[in-house]
Amino acid sequence: MGDMYDEQFDKAGGPADLMDDSWVESTAWKDLLKKLHSVKFALQSGRDEITGLLTTLSRQCPYSPYEQFPERKVYFLLDSRANNALGVIQNASAFKRRADEKNAVAGVTNIPANPNTTVTTNQGSTTTTKANTSSTLEEDLYTYYKFDDASTTFHKSLTSLENMQLKSYYRRNFEKNFGVKFGSASTPASGGSGATPPPASGGAVRPNP
């Protein structure tokens, strides 16, 4: 038989139960947080970048019953808090803004208190035209505030991830923590237990008392 982990691997709460969880190599995790921190969320290109970063992040389990935990590498085990925060960031990055993106960087344009317009006709009379307060303006304001919510959610979730203490494992503490050993499966000795080996001198074999 080939090399594999011993029976401790399959015990409740052991490594076998964690194989479907999210594991991220420590360097890749730190690189992800650094890139997310530098993203310009106000720009659509920045939000698209977030989607790409999360899509390419490998979260596969680095071991199996027949594959020993990697040597000289540290992995973080992502718990429910980390996975939820990543999901929130993914949802926030999916926001599509209809208004000009420059407004999101500069802030909301001030709206006059009385935005009515007065026009003088050829006959000398004046007419007053009320500003557009219909659905277009309402949609722009709604879109802005929804964007503001998405931006706030993104930055709060990122800060949470940066301050989160995750469980980290490398080969030695992984195998020590779970009490597992990796190696060749033992095979029973030929001849069965209790068999008496032949004498070196070639003399007669005496029966066991």
Curated annotation (Swiss-Prot):
It is found in: Virion. Coiled coil: none annotated. Residues 116-132 have a biased composition (Low complexity). This is Coat protein. Its main location: virion. Keywords: Capsid protein, Virion. One of its GO terms (cellular component) is viral capsid. It comes from Tobacco rattle virus (strain PSG).
